Amino acid sequence: MLDVNFFDELRIGLATAEDIRQWSYGEVKKPETINYRTLKPEKDGLFCEKIFGPTRDWECYCGKYKRVPFKGIICERCGVEVTRAKVRRERMGHIELAAPVTHIWYFKGVPSRLGYLLDLAPKDLEKIIYFAAYVITSVDEEMRHNELSTLEAEMAVERKAVEDQRDGELEARAQKLEADLAELEAEGAKADARRKVRDGGEREMRQIRDRAQRELDRLEDIWSTFTKLAPKQLIVDENLYRELVDRYGEYFTGAMGAESIQKLIENFDIDAEAESLRDVIRNGKGQKKLRALKRLKVVAAFQQSGNSPMGMVLDAVPVIPPELRPMVQLDGGRFATSDLNDLYRRVINRNNRLKRLIDLGAPEIIVNNEKRMLQESVDALFDNGRRGRPVTGPGNRPLKSLSDLLKGKQGRFRQNLLGKRVDYSGRSVIVVGPQLKLHQCGLPKLMALELFKPFVMKRLVDLNHAQNIKSAKRMVERQRPQVWDVLEEVIAEHPVLLNRAPTLHRLGIQAFEPMLVEGKAIQLHPLVCEAFNADFDGDQMAVHLPLSAEAQAEARILMLSSNNILSPASGRPLAMPRLDMVTGLYYLTTEVPGDTGEYQPASGDHPETGVYSSPAEAIMAADRGVLSVRAKIKVRLTQLRPPVEIEAELFGHSGWQPGDAWMAETTLGRVMFNELLPLGYPFVNKQMHKKVQAAIINDLAERYPMIVVAQTVDKLKDAGFYWATRSGVTVSMADVLVPPRKKEILDHYEERADKVEKQFQRGALNHDERNEALVEIWKEATDEVGQALREHYPDDNPIITIVDSGATGNFTQTRTLAGMKGLVTNPKGEFIPRPVKSSFREGLTVLEYFINTHGARKGLADTALRTADSGYLTRRLVDVSQDVIVREHDCQTERGIVVELAERAPDGTLIRDPYIETSAYARTLGTDAVDEAGNVIVERGQDLGDPEIDALLAAGITQVKVRSVLTCATSTGVCATCYGRSMATGKLVDIGEAVGIVAAQSIGEPGTQLTMRTFHQGGVGEDITGGLPRVQELFEARVPRGKAPIADVTGRVRLEDGERFYKITIVPDDGGEEVVYDKISKRQRLRVFKHEDGSERVLSDGDHVEVGQQLMEGSADPHEVLRVQGPREVQIHLVREVQEVYRAQGVSIHDKHIEVIVRQMLRRVTIIDSGSTEFLPGSLIDRAEFEAENRRVVAEGGEPAAGRPVLMGITKASLATDSWLSAASFQETTRVLTDAAINCRSDKLNGLKENVIIGKLIPAGTGINRYRNIAVQPTEEARAAAYTIPSYEDQYYSPDFGAATGAAVPLDDYGYSDYR
């Protein structure tokens, strides 16, 4: 049987009226929903049981048949099938419309698909559909041509008749006038009386002429309209149309409303139209060609997909199942209903009224009005508010239509398909659990009991504590004593997942082994707080339970916290000692001169003191109080490895072995610290600042297995907390010391500030200069107070200990507390020239407090905005990169990128590249790295870790070629070798790893730390965008603010300095055409760069520039970089620019993550010439598809298509993805679905999102095909065992089982007695 959940692709298309009737289980004829008295559905109404199925399981409407035995019977009284009530979730109905209507998506979308197909302007289309104009649907050209002369003669006769009548009337009137005048003259009337009569007569004659002329014009209009009549012609004048129908009705047909559109589509020849459009594209120019291209996209979509365009005009409307638009009774007898029911009711009401009017033979104008209203009600049902005012419900709220159910964050896609609520989960407040191991978490007993309830119940039955599941459930609910023992047993080895929202990167969900704890709070290991970004001020976390064996295995192996020590963004450890732990280890390893029991060399008759034969002896002395752990001593060590240089000196080539003794001059604290490190790690004899601790853990992560690192950080945590407690570091008011010299320092600077103020008042300085001078003065003052403060504080001051150890805070904060706050900024980011002279210890004056709050509030507002922006950036990044999955081991490409390892200084020494951590580190080498003598230092295909990089630098190699995602040749996704080491595991990335999502999270997660503001460089200069807006600008491939021109060619610069503008001309070296950059604003300033002679200075006249070099300050436009230097350069440019923003904030992200995103931005090619391929010019095609199609066409002897690479922003690239499901769930849902339906798009379900939406395993990690399709191959022993079955005749078993089938392995002993 076919499994409905097992399919390889999902196609979307246009439904015709036939399809809609096929899906339907019956026609909904009445607008009624349910009977308010019986609360049962009305027959033929929107909830009808006959159509949609029974409301109660196995029970018909009238109650004749009840219960399962009657399954499948259709009741002859009420017509309801006896079946499960859940069919009401899947059975559809339909409404037969009395007049066709158009589908608003296809008529109103931008661009209007109906308009493009029929070549009608959307305005005209609207007039036709909403009964404001008639359209000619067909003209019998032949008949009109044959009878044209007869008709013309008839028309001539008619005109002649009108003219004759006019002439007759004029003549009669003229005669009457003559007679009247003669009569007046005879009476001897006055002249003005005669003039009045004459004027009146002439006026009447003029009216006769005008009337006749109007009639002649009308006839002329009718005739000319008729002779030029063509299909798709609009006639807005109703009288004109009526005349045409009366006179020439047999020569043409016309109509208004959706019926006319339906007729036009029926008569539309898609193939002929496509051919004529292709012809226009080949030979046309300008606007005409562009319009033809756009129309061809729509026409070709119908031509290729085999969709019938008739689907855009509906004769029947589907009614979705009633359970999806429920109606529920509230307390108080009122009903709450889905908006869809109201929208359907309007459609049915109007449809029934229209049917009645047609049956009654109502006048056309009334029928047309009703048809228009029907069209509007169907529009509102499909997409309310798309045209005109939206239909509103009670309280003027727009009703939610079918489109609104899909759109947006609350729509079906994002609310229910991409994120679901799950059972077996709970949440609670977190507290710190310092006694836990790294892989453990404390789970409250009550919560654990509820989570593991089914497991506990089953185990109770197994152990005979309970007779059946029901009594077991009762035991659990009453919390009997046996339950707790069973719970302990059940949770052992069963990991749980902990998650803290917001989950910004993959470490936001980790697996732990639960330990039962009293209380109601979850206990969290202190070292994982960094990864979760958790603190204990009331944060909550959610617990989830992996149920299946596979889920548990994945949680344990892949997600256990002790396996996730490294950051996926930088590959460096995240589980580091922090805060108290740092302080404790810093205290432990500090050396205090003159402390108790310090080593004293022998002098005179005093022997040397403070020398110990072993750490144990030293600890004994410390316990007796004669030695301080921080005093310098000499101690003989046998179990700790000496530092590298001492080891080389003492033990030579053979090296130190455990048990070899050596003397160390150190402190007991440092010996104790080193005993925490793994055996064989060289002795570290220095004070443990946070940076040193980080370096050690980094080194451990590079050289030791993860489990050793996890154990070590756990030991460091325990020691850190222990010694932090022992150190007694606390902060009180008495520790905040105000420097005594502060007043005199400030007085001195006050004088300088007064001088500047006076100069300003005299007019010697302008406002800006005065501000700059004051800012400079007060900056110096603040620094000097800080200096005085540092000198005044003793080294053992707790505040200084906390800051110096790197636990938290920095010296600026100490200065603010005890020295002076200094200058503060206003919301624009400019310094206010009055400093805050008080410290927080002394207290601020009212004015100081006020100006201080100014910038602080801006900071808070910024943070709120930044969080939302950063989340949206992450969402777009995930969307664009979600289908980048490692698909194969090696794509065998020879290409790669060159990265710098070091720079040669003028004296020949190597200066290590500061960005080596994010560029060369953790890459796969693309070619052998060879030194000057030709020795291979590191072979091709090796992973560059810290040891390899050190070896390369030692050999004097300054740059290497490494494999990169940018040059990977895998068609979908990337290969493992090009991606290199997985930052999170420290090993080569596994096939199936979703590196795209990891990349998006690594870039998005620190997004909140990036500043919002665009910072001002130098006074009035152009704003240079920085921080988050700059990252968005780069990833969206926008033209940057303050765009800087780049050199199109290599050549000499000619610089013309105008009044407000520069004009730069480049004279190319190859003698080509000169390139001129005109009107470059002087506010932008010329670029400073290295010249041929090695000096760094501003660009000036006569300088030599290379192609692609930036000429002005600011940012280059990536599209120009692509045009001038090609795709490879623009990729490197984007990676470099994004990294600059993150580095400015001190965030370390590996280049490879940014490369993954940039690769997606440059995935497409725009077709310039289609050659012999099916591609349309101007369309965007995936590069892999483009190359494959070209290879195919060339092999068949055709012309390949020509295309050029195009850089797309991440939003555009996400919407251009091949998967319509993924695009629709991202943004612009209705537009994506409209397009996909017309093209009859098929979703191959390659990415992650699409599979999440339809509820399949995602094709990443263990869900990838190569891991799912596994057959068990028997071992040789099993095969041999298979042959030991007593053999019958040969024909039963073929002698060879072959590799394909696998041998039959007996599972239990056969009893053969029956056969004998």
From Swiss-Prot:
Positions that bind Zn(2+) 2: 891, 968, 975, 978
EC numbers, comma separated: 2.7.7.6
Keyword Nucleotide-binding: no
UniProt cofactor note: Binds 1 Mg(2+) ion per subunit. Binds 2 Zn(2+) ions per subunit.
Chain residues that bind Zn(2+) 1: 60, 62, 75, 78
Organism: Mycobacterium bovis (strain BCG / Pasteur 1173P2)
Protein name per the record: DNA-directed RNA polymerase subunit beta'
Function per UniProt: DNA-dependent RNA polymerase catalyzes the transcription of DNA into RNA using the four ribonucleoside triphosphates as substrates.
GO biological process: DNA-templated transcription
